[in-house]
Amino acid sequence: MKTIRLFLLGVCLGLAHAAGAQSYLPQKSAFSIGAGPMWGIVEGKGNFHDEVGATTCGFFGMEYRYYAIPNIALGVAYNHLWGSKDNNSLSCNYVAPTFTARWLWAEDRQGFWMTVGVGYFGYKDDLTYGDEFKKGYLGASFSVGYEFAIAGGVGLQLRADCLAADFKYNGYRYGHSHHYYDDWDSSMSYLSLGVALVFGK
């Protein structure tokens, strides 16, 4: 019995070593999908976090990358932000072309990357003491992350994502945000810390 256990242990270790030797991160194209908690890091006068108070929201993201070389990629990203508190709700959608720079090591099984993008940021909130507010803005994104391979062409990312846009306060909200003037310019920024699964070739 002891011999069988040692044999099985040896087989498992051998398979694990073989899998590790064959694992690598995508080099040509990659698709990632992930999620995590999200916080507002700038007050953004008149927006959801300012009106209902600081609250943790949710973040969901998808991204496609085409690697011109293993260290440089062009792609497109989609992010969805949502939150609710005391029957007040937030829903934002962001889509943008992206540029990624990546540094690989450990025989292409580990990497660190940075991604920037500029695109459309669609903001919508619905507050219990006011009407729904919905508007599109020019948005920007900055993301950094560490990724490691778990199989051939499959990896896991630990990432931080920051989204920002210029929040144009206007008279539509004046009825219940009377402590601000019309056309008050303010920025809004969000930070998410999450994980993502990436796969490709």
Model segments located where?
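Outer-membrane beta-barrel translocator domains and adjoining extracellular loop/strand segments
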Residues: 43-51, 85-92, 124-133, 168-177
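Short glycine/proline- and aromatic-enriched beta-strand/turn motifs that initiate or cap beta-hairpins
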Residues: 21-67, 73-74, 188-201
